[in-house]
């Protein structure tokens, strides 16, 4: 069996899909379906069982067994960069992850988990997986950073695989439940389908992020599991592209040209990553050599998926 926490969420459900594509269906999805919209991410997928995340944690802490577990993909977390309840964030992202990590270590179960580029904070260069480059801007980034630091202490002595992925700006299918936290591509598509003029912040040609397609993210997760490599790795494309480029790709798909530029919100100033670009040196050195989709390629594929029933 393979366990995917956050398996009804954005990246988790895409990992489930990639496992299904390899013929793997003996999957336990762990999540919190209090948000009644997330289930749609699983409707077209095949899994063996589902468990609520609180019930799962109780069983993990009690040392209960789940049969022969081949791997744990730990994607479950509060990923809102605007959530400022520090206790909730640390319980949900840090303590939970520690419990699950130790459960896996005691049983030699490969543990692959979601870290984040938010660990780098407001940097504009040198996004490198090393302590001197890490300075998160929000409690979400701090919770991810602290768990990475915890893993770094354990890695030298670990007898089983531990690998963390610092996700950059992930976009693509199965993110609709995220609402305001969904990608710019998702929101642009919604606006265009509603007959609205799509909106970007002023200066969007200067805001550049490493936008990585979720299908590529799932591919990297599965490659590392299949190859048993441990460590903490950036997971982006290695290219910074502008929000304007995302809009251009969405407009091209919809055969539109008009854009409206809106003022940048005061509340986000100083807490907003204006530039991200993954340094892929360590990822490539680990042996992962597949190319990543460009914004033009990924957004076009995503638009086709979003509008598949249109």
Swiss-Prot record:
NADP(+) binds at residues 10-11, 31-32, 38, 53, 75-79, 92, 144, 170, 178. Catalyzes the interconversion between ADP-D-glycero-beta-D-manno-heptose and ADP-L-glycero-beta-D-manno-heptose via an epimerization at carbon 6 of the heptose. GO terms for molecular function: ADP-glyceromanno-heptose 6-epimerase activity; NADP binding. Contains a large N-terminal NADP-binding domain, and a smaller C-terminal substrate-binding domain. It is an enzyme of class 5 (isomerase). The active site is at residues 140, 178. Binds 1 NADP(+) per subunit. GO terms for biological process: ADP-L-glycero-beta-D-manno-heptose biosynthetic process; carbohydrate metabolic process. Pathway: Nucleotide-sugar biosynthesis; ADP-L-glycero-beta-D-manno-heptose biosynthesis; ADP-L-glycero-beta-D-manno-heptose from D-glycero-beta-D-manno-heptose 7-phosphate: step 4/4. Its cofactor is NADP(+). Homopentamer. Coiled coil: none annotated. Signal peptide: none annotated. It comes from Citrobacter koseri (strain ATCC BAA-895 / CDC 4225-83 / SGSC4696). Its EC number is 5.1.3.20. Belongs to the NAD(P)-dependent epimerase/dehydratase family. HldD subfamily. This is ADP-L-glycero-D-manno-heptose-6-epimerase. The gene is hldD. InterPro entries: Epimerase_deHydtase, Heptose_epim, NAD(P)-bd_dom_sf.
